[in-house]
């Protein structure tokens, strides 16, 4: 296959990737967007394998088969509840690949006669390894936190921001020396030192971020993995990899910015690491008062007597796989003429759009699934709100307690409804480790137990 045909194939693949992103931005077209992405990737792989500069095609096919087998196994094995940690670990692979490509590009380089071109190449190698290493360890930490293998609490090192700044400054100095020196031995030594710094830097960046902010971290790492892929594209002189990496990097950065606005966080503080780490609390159960318990039968009766119901799901719904009986309850209530809608917080769950994916999987109509800004004004006119597995995203302390770690974060104002039913396993705090005053309000009742079991019991009572 000639280089011209390969270039044309890359252009078609890049356009399909853009269509894929556009399709994935809406529920209605998400399946079509996925299809565009699959076709684009297939074209890119075929063009790369059959390209004029391809060598060791047999090894490439072996690697593809191994990757495909692993991918198919993961697709069949991994539950929707495990999707956040799967995304995180996949990001780590992109980062590690960029590191390996960087070292390989340096070793395989025969040098450039033009000094400027040689300096550009060395800068590409250095930055590619740095970004890849940060993405790799950052994603590994995110995977550990999301899967429960690591504590969700932030790592509070003294002078952590100064340490981050020092890592960047030292890495920049190493870059300058790396480009200026003509000693290959010194360049290898500098690359190894920089890689160690970048690995520690990536680990510290994510480890110092509080658990409640993990959805932002996932989208941020998505952006990092895109830039790592773009850096690999520069080192490999692969135009499609550069374009694809830039698409992923920019879309991830935009998503992170949107989510930061939804959480009243600074985008810079996300990149710097260590936000959402205030250790203060909003008080103990004894200080807040008593909570009231309810039963599935009582909740069913309350729902029958309601004219409007809003359901606000959270990660607890995902863990319990309660989206299917929730969809069944929605259908039954709508058949009775009750107005049922869903209120989705931008950072509900452990992944951007986590709840939307679960509800779409359960065939909940798209038009009744509303974002926080679209539904917040309607809670005061709502008879009953079902809070299923959500905690921090419905915490009134964000508005009422200036000393709360989540102070200023926009939340779903569920407490303004006539009745609030909170589905929880226990009175433990949420992922942010903050007690929720909602549980102790007069119009709130607690329904303890597994969310799926509770919803099934309500469904039977209806």
In which residue ranges do the predicted regions lie?
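Cytoplasmic-side transmembrane-helix entry/capping segments in multi-pass membrane proteins
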Residues: 31-40, 60-63, 82-94, 154-165, ...
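Transmembrane alpha-helix boundary signature
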Residues: 48-61, 73-83, 99-116, 179-183
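Mobile "lid/hinge" segments at catalytic clefts and subdomain interfaces of large enzymes
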Residues: 210, 224-268
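Structured cytosolic domains appended to multi-pass membrane proteins
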Residues: 287-462
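Transmembrane helix-loop junctions at the membrane interface of multipass transporters and ion channels
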Residues: 104-116, 180-185, 216, 223-244
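C-terminal ends of transmembrane helices
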Residues: 16-29, 68-87, 139-154, 200-214, ...
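Structural signature of hydrophobic alpha-helical transmembrane segments
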Residues: 1-14, 51-69, 121-136, 184-197
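Membrane-interfacial segments at transmembrane helix termini in multi-pass membrane proteins
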Residues: 247-306
């Amino acid at each position: 296959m000639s280089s011209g045909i390969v270039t044309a194939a890359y252009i078609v693949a890049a356009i399909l990737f853009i269509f894929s992103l556009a399709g994935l931005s809406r529920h209605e077209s998400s399946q079509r967007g996925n299809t565009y992405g699959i076709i684009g990737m297939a074209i890119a792989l075929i063009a790369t394998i059959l390209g004029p500069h391809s060598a060791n095609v047999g090894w490439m096919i072996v690697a593809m088969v191994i990757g495909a087998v692993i991918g198919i196994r993961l697709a069949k094995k991994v539950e929707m509840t495990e999707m956040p940690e799967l995304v995180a670990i996949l990001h780590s692979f992109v980062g590690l690949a960029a590191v390996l490509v960087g070292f390989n590009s340096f070793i395989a380089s025969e040098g450039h006669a033009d000094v400027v071109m040689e300096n550009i190449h060395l800068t590409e190698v250095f930055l590619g390894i740095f970004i890849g290493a940060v993405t790799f360890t950052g994603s590994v930490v995110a995977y550990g936190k999301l899967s429960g293998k690591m504590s969700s609490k932030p790592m509070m090192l003294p002078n952590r921001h100064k340490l981050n700044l020092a890592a960047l400054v030292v890495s920049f100095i190493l870059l300058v020396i790396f480009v200026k020196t003509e000693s290959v031995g010194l360049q290898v030594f500098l690359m190894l030192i920089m890689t160690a710094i970048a690995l520690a830097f990536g680990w510290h960046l994510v480890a110092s971020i509080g658990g409640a902010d993990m959805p932002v971290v996932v989208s941020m790492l998505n952006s990092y993995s895109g830039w790592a892929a773009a850096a690999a594209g520069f080192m490999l002189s692969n135009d499609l990899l550069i374009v694809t990496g830039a698409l992923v990097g920019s879309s991830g950065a935009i998503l992170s910015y949107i989510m930061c606005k939804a959480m009243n966080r600074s985008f810079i503080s996300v990149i710097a690491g260590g936000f959402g780490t205030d250790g203060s609390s909003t008080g103990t159960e004894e200080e807040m008062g008593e909570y009231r318990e309810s039963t599935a039968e009582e909740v069913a009766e309350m729902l029958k007597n309601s004219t409007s119901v809003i359901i606000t799901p959270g990660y607890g719904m995902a863990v319990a796989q309660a989206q299917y009986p929730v969809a069944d309850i929605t259908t039954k209530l709508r058949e009775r003429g009750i107005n049922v809608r869903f209120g989705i917080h931008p950072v509900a769950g452990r992944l951007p759009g986590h709840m939307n994916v679960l509800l779409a999987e359960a065939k909940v109509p798209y038009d009744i699934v509303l974002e926080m800004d679209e539904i917040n004004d309607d809670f005061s006119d709502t008879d009953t709100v079902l809070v299923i597995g959500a905690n921090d995203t419905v915490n009134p302390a964000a508005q009422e307690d200036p000393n709360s770690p989540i102070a200023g974060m926009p939340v779903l104002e569920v407490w303004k409804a006539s009745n609030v039913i909170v589905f929880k396993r226990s009175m433990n705090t949420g992922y942010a480790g903050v007690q929720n005053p909602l549980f102790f309000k007069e119009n709130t009742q607690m329904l303890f137990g597994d969310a799926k079991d509770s919803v099934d019991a309500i469904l039977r009572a209806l």
